[in-house]
């Protein structure tokens, strides 16, 4: 999830608290973005950059899933910063203490030789401890980076299209009454959160197979479903968007042109229904306003 806004605290940028609600976020974004709108500052490139960052902050905080992911990463960064500050303070204290002891040692001409040896031994011990602390810190940072990488892989990203997270499932028509929405969800939800399940409605007797499209929330979930052993009633499971191939020879499992057209029509119908629902929600919201 590394991006141009990683070093910016979105809450500070919008001037809001961490527990701010959607209404507060929207109000703060609207007020600040109007101030830095490029149309009002045509000769100030920094204003355009600030306006862009405000839009990124608003998009990240207004979306529940993106805000949850951002808060998790932000908390980890703050915790890491506090640990680094504590480590630097501890190391500085150790160095200051060591220098003070050395100063006392060299200022005191009456100290015996064995006292100097003892202090030198302690110096080596402190250096060893400092090296151990540094190794521990490096290990923690490496572990946190790996955890952050795993979290990013599980976070919904606009860079991964819905098509890339979609799989196509095919089963024989004789199982049409058994393989339904509930059946598919019970099996494939075990691989991760499902965004949508679309099943072919018009099943012609001439058709040998029935199709379904499942859209996962993450690419890794779709990948797991593709590579898992398929249930007995399922004929095959493939990517909806097939990988590029240099071979022009069709295989036994290749989707025909007609099959792909049916799948495309299913997706278009589903998109149309979603758009209708969205328009109805907007109309209801306008009437209630």
Curated annotation (Swiss-Prot):
| InterPro entries, alphabetized | DnaJ_domain (IPR001623), DnaJ_domain_CS (IPR018253), J_dom_sf (IPR036869), Nucleotide-bd_a/b_plait_sf (IPR012677), Pre-mRNA-splicing_ERAD (IPR052094), RBD_domain_sf (IPR035979)
Q: Say yes or no: keyword Chaperone present.
A: yes
Cell compartments where the protein resides: Cytoplasm; Nucleus
> Which GO cellular component terms are attached?
cytoplasm; nucleolus; nucleus; spliceosomal complex; U2-type spliceosomal complex
Record Gene3D superfamilies:
3.30.70.330, DnaJ domain
Highest taxon listed in the record's lineage: Eukaryota
Basic and acidic residues composition-biased segments: 129-148
Q: Keywords in UniProt for this one?
A: Chaperone, Cytoplasm, mRNA processing, mRNA splicing, Nucleus, Spliceosome
The primary location reported for this protein is cytoplasm
According to the UniProt entry, where is the signal peptide?
none
Q: Name one GO molecular function term.
A: nucleic acid binding
Which family is annotated? Belongs to the DnaJ family.
Quaternary form?
Answer: Belongs to the 40S cdc5-associated complex (or cwf complex), a spliceosome sub-complex reminiscent of a late-stage spliceosome composed of the U2, U5 and U6 snRNAs and at least brr2, cdc5, cwf2/prp3, cwf3/syf1, cwf4/syf3, cwf5/ecm2, spp42/cwf6, cwf7/spf27, cwf8, cwf9, cwf10, cwf11, cwf12, prp45/cwf13, cwf14, cwf15, cwf16, cwf17, cwf18, cwf19, cwf20, cwf21, cwf22, cwf23, cwf24, cwf25, cwf26, cyp7/cwf27, cwf28, cwf29/ist3, lea1, msl1, prp5/cwf1, prp10, prp12/sap130, prp17, prp22, sap61, sap62, sap114, sap145, slu7, smb1, smd1, smd3, smf1, smg1 and syf2.
Task performed by this protein: Involved in pre-mRNA splicing. May be involved in endoplasmic reticulum-associated protein degradation (ERAD) and required for growth at low and high temperatures.
Q: What is this protein called?
A: Pre-mRNA-splicing factor cwf23
What is the organism of origin for this protein? Schizosaccharomyces pombe (strain 972 / ATCC 24843) (Fission yeast)
The lineage is: Eukaryota, Fungi, Dikarya, Ascomycota, Taphrinomycotina
Gene designation per UniProt: cwf23
